[in-house]
């Protein structure tokens, strides 16, 4: 897990979700790695000590009971963000290297499923999502939520048209762990199927044996999941999806950012994002299988 200081208010929810899944799979061998990122290159703080926003979680049960490997990044280091972390943390010998995000909670049986799955080739495993902004995401949408997602036909296009859908859960809805567990408990047996490549970085399980790098060396953040998806396509790495288990990616989390007024519309953010996307384009153009 890579946590920025301004994501602090989501950590308790995220970590308790991981704890629940760990305790539900006592036989699974899980090594937890966490990066606390205190850098302020992009987001200017409105609080006196961004560091304290993350340090307060040192006594959390996840820290105390499972002793994660902790990495610290601050302004004494060059610019470092989630794409750097994901590029560096991959373990080609581990059964799975899992990407998570601060705004995402996981199914109770997440680690039990990973412990159970046996696929004898490099692959990527994902968990089902909610209806997104267009039908291209249907291939990785939970099987009980299909049939609701329709692209906007308005002219001009309206980004919020999905609000009109009748789906019980949409990508903009905030879902709690209790609600996620109830939905998944009612979803029956584990169904895993091969799907066309469609990856979002909120919860991705990357098997052993992948050729690296699969994220452009010059990428720091923004679209590293897209870069990985394109690499999988080019290298014919299959994707499978647990279509009967919903992940809880709270894209519009009510406490997404604390201690800063910065947003993705800031010029500094756009500058770093453009650099990362340029690095991705160059990397993919020169990629061989």
Region roles according to the model:
Residues 40-94:
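Active-site-proximal specificity loops/subdomain of glycosyltransferases
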Residues 13-29, 41, 56-61:
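Short, acidic, metal-binding catalytic loop of nucleotide-sugar glycosyltransferases
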Residues 107-216:
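Conserved catalytic core of nucleotide-sugar-dependent glycosyltransferases
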Residues 94-105:
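Short beta-strand-to-loop acidic/aromatic patch adjacent to the donor-nucleotide binding site
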Residues 31-35, 240:
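A structural signal for isolated positions on well-ordered beta-strands in alpha/beta enzyme cores
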Residues 183-289:
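C-terminal catalytic/acceptor-binding lobe
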Residues 94, 121-123, 237:
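Short, high-confidence coil segments that cap the C-terminus of an alpha-helix
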Residues 1-14, 21, 34-39, 129-130:
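A conserved hydrophobic helix/loop-capping motif in glycosyltransferases and polysaccharide synthases
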């Amino acid at each position: 897990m890579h946590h920025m200081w301004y994501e602090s208010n989501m950590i308790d929810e995220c970590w308790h979700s991981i704890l629940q899944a760990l305790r539900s799979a006592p036989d699974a061998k899980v090594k937890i790695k966490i990066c606390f990122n205190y850098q302020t290159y992009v987001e200017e703080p409105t609080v006196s000590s961004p560091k304290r926003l993350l340090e307060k979680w040192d006594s959390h049960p996840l820290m105390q009971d499972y002793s994660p490997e902790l990495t610290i990044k601050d302004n004494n280091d060059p610019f470092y963000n989630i794409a750097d972390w994901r590029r560096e943390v991959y373990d080609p010998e581990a059964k799975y290297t899992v990407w998570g995000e601060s705004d995402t909670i996981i199914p109770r049986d997440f680690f039990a499923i990973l412990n159970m799955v046996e696929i004898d080739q490099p692959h990527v495993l994902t968990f089902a999502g909610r209806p997104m902004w267009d039908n291209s995401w249907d291939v990785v949408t939970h099987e009980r939520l299909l049939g609701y997602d329709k692209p906007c036909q308005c002219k001009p296009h309206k980004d919020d048209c999905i609000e009109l859908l009748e789906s019980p859960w949409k990508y903009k809805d905030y879902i709690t762990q209790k609600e996620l567990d109830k939905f998944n408990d009612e979803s029956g047996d584990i169904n895993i199927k091969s799907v066309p490549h469609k990856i979002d970085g909120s919860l991705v399980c990357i098997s052993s044996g992948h050729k690296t790098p699969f994220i452009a060396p010059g990428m720091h953040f923004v679209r590293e999941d897209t870069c990985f998806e394109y690499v999988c396509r080019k290298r014919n790495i299959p994707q499978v999806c647990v279509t009967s288990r919903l992940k809880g990616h709270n894209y519009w989390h009510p406490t997404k950012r604390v201690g800063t007024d910065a947003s993705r519309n800031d010029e500094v953010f756009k500058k770093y994002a453009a650099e990362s996307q340029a690095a991705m384009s160059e990397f993919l153009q020169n990629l061989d299988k």
